[in-house]
Design a protein with these regions (language model features):
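Nucleic-acid endo/exonuclease domains
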Residues: 2-147, 171-177, 182-197
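Short hydrophobic/aromatic beta-strand element in the GNAT-like acyltransferase core
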Residues: 147-150, 160
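Conserved hydrophobic "DFG−1" position in protein kinase catalytic cores
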Residues: 42, 151-153, 165
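Compact, aliphatic and Gly/Pro-tolerant "microcore" segments centered on a short helix or tight beta-hairpin
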Residues: 133, 150-156
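Conserved beta-strand in the GNAT
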Residues: 155-166, 171-172
């Protein structure tokens, strides 16, 4: 929904809009942010979705300034609207992950099989196991860490949480992802509790 890109939605925006059609989304909403456009808006969820094409949103092509997207995010938060920002490269490289995450946020994934964390077991897993899982299920893919934890259900890995020890005694939760084909209820809490112990 960029004025430089023409009046048509991009293929990605159209796909996202169509996926959300049962929730009555609004295209190019301009009233909430006093004239600034939100590409796709879901009034029932107070949720906006912005799709940022890389070419037209770079300074080189006369696009947005460095703080434009942050400013729009802050404007949305001030108005009580959560904003999902999707960059073209993320969508093109991780389309299935992006669509699954949006579907989960708005509650369209209720048909997915549910797995409850209480029926699962936490294991320390190998770097290779974490890498394969995160590259398939996390928008940013794998990142090296100091500790790799996996949640397994009947022997299958359904969630991964990784931690990086920045300095002695100071840990950073580096990555968390669940299997995108399932709803893994309570997975984050169970993995984090294991880490704290």
């Amino acid at each position: 929904g960029c004025p430089h890109c023409g009046n048509n939605l991009s293929n990605a925006e159209t796909e996202i809009f169509n996926m959300l059609s049962t929730l009555n989304p609004i295209q190019r909403e301009r009233t909430i942010l006093d004239g600034k456009e939100i590409d796709i808006y879901l009034p029932s969820h107070k949720l906006g979705i912005e799709y940022h094409g890389l070419r037209w949103h770079t300074d080189f092509f006369g696009g947005k300034g460095r703080t434009y997207h942050l400013s729009k995010l802050n404007d949305c938060l001030y108005k009580g609207v959560n904003l999902i920002q999707i960059f073209e490269d993320e969508y093109m490289n991780n389309r299935e992950i992006v669509l699954n995450k949006i579907s989960h946020i708005v509650g369209l994934d209720n048909a997915k099989p549910k797995i409850f964390a209480r029926k699962c077991v936490v294991h320390e897993i190998t770097k290779d196991e974490a890498k394969e899982f995160l590259n398939r299920n996390h928008i940013q893919g794998f990142a090296s860490a100091s500790l790799y934890l996996g949640l397994k259900y009947e022997g299958s890995l359904i969630a991964v949480m990784t931690f990086l020890e920045e300095s002695e005694g100071y840990w950073n939760l580096n990555r968390f992802a669940t299997e995108i084909t399932h709803n893994c209820i309570g997975a984050g809490g169970k993995l984090f509790k294991y880490f704290i112990r």
